[in-house]
Amino acid sequence: GKISQDGQGQFGFESANDSLLSGINGRKSIEVSTDGQAIPGTVTDDVPATNGANVTLTLDLDLQTYVQQQLEQAKANSGAKSASAVVLDAKTAQVMAMATSDSIDPMGDIKKQLEQGKEFGNSTISAPFEPGSVAKIITAAGAIENGVTSPDEVHTVPGSIDMAGGNVKDAWDHGPAQYTTTGIFGKSSNVGTLMLAEKLGEDKFDQLLTGFGVGRATGIELPSESEGLLPQRAQWSGGTFANLPIGQGMSVTLLQMAGIYQAIANGGADCAADYFRGAGWSWCGGGPAGAGAHPGGE
């Protein structure tokens, strides 16, 4: 972020938390003589200034630098238009690194960066996308947590499956194949994933998505966070359940997706993502404060 010449937050963290960081001006009224000297005992209004809060960001500078460098290299190697990355501490959900290739560096030439197409926004929280197969982890977690399968259970997975009048196939042609639950997700099988989702049922799967925070902002201390998109259960059409378990028909931000994996890595405890310590910050650590039990938690 950046502050203006008068010390007000202009964008980024400094803008979102301007009232926290700025403090409150003080004031004092006192009579003075004709030559400008203060007259003792004439103070009528004396309110001391209040300092702004001391805040320490959770970012690891070395890791942030490394991630930014790797991000730029990956973008160049792949020919992508943009790239972004988020690294969370699995136990606390503290943001250890958050990098984008298209955000303005507040310490650089702002005008030049704008001409290059860079933006003031932070795409890791403001640019939702359809996650696709990376969101199949939600189906996997829900199926195992609810006892409809186990990691080593063997399934006969056909090459396609009929869902609400439509036919969904895997990315590769195959006849009936034997896959364990682990193998279904290792191969990223659409068909196998939908088979397990059907065992969960639509209502349970909707609760699962909601519990993992899909369609809900994380509440991170940064401006312009998007909620993403999750169709309301009452608005589901016939094909909705053929899409959601394989990461289609919904959108998430990169931070939301990272948070889903954080919850799983933390044994099912979802800690709200934190960007700074201090000013009331508390460690979640997978405990009950600020944590929700997943799948299907609050």
Tell what function each PLM region has.
Residues P40-A83:
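Conserved, well-ordered alpha-helix/loop/beta-strand core segments that scaffold catalytic motifs
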Residues G1, L59, D89:
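Flexible glycine-/small-residue-rich
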Residues A85-V87:
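Short beta-strand scaffold segments in enzyme catalytic cores
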Residues G1-G52:
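Small/polar-residue-rich segments within soluble enzyme cores
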Residues T34-T44, D89-S133, I138-E298:
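Beta-lactam-recognizing serine transpeptidase/beta-lactamase-like catalytic domain environment
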